[in-house]
């Protein structure tokens, strides 16, 4: 790579424990991430990094990125740790320990999904969920769909729920994009529209 154009932005996953959702928001990256981008150009020869922000903006950024384990939904991590018998996630010696509230939230979510018993043991569904490399909510949906004989349809829906909204609306072509998207509209259900 000879040249890098750095916007200073990236889509960063953040979990909101209040709503129980993870969203990818365009956010400012840390100084360390900016330096990493700069380091990508010119490794094998001369390179150029153009930053689309000023020095003052760079200096106002956080020095390092908050570790993902401190900003993510921990339900999947907890499910895998229990499945692999790695011990109590609340006592695990993480390099950057997650907040205790996030661990409690992960356990609560797994109990609600039927993956754990009240005393934190894996259920039969929990063992199946741990085998699927997905958010536990999506793996639970797939297991339920299998039981209803709708595996194919449920996998399509789970895949659609796992990504950002695929409907792109370029600012200068919003009207045209809306017309095209209307072809796939189903007034009864967003899920039917996805299928």
Range-by-range predicted roles:
Residues 1-5, 13, 55-195:
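Second RecA-like catalytic domain
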Residues 3, 9-61, 75-79:
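Conserved segment of the helicase C-terminal RecA-like domain
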């Amino acid at each position: 790579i000879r040249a890098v154009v750095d916007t200073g932005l990236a889509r960063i996953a953040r979990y909101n424990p209040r709503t129980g959702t993870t969203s990818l928001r365009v956010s400012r990256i840390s100084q360390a991430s900016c330096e990493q981008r700069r380091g990508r150009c010119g490794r094998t020869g001369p390179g150029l990094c153009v930053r689309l922000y000023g020095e003052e903006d760079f200096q106002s950024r956080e020095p390092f990125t908050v570790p993902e384990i401190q900003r993510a939904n921990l339900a999947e991590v907890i499910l895998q740790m229990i499945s692999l018998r790695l011990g109590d996630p609340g006592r695990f010696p993480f390099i950057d320990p997650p907040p205790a509230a996030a661990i409690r939230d992960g356990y609560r979510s797994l109990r609600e999904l039927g993956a754990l018993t009240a005393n934190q043991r894996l259920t039969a569904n929990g063992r199946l969920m741990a085998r699927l490399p997905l958010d536990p909510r999506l793996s639970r949906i797939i297991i339920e769909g299998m039981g209803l004989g709708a595996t194919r349809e449920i996998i399509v829906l789970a895949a659609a729920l796992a990504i950002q909204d695929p409907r792109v609306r370029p600012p200068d072509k919003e009207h045209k994009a809306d017309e095209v998207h209307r072809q796939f509209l189903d007034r009864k259900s967003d899920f039917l529209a996805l299928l």
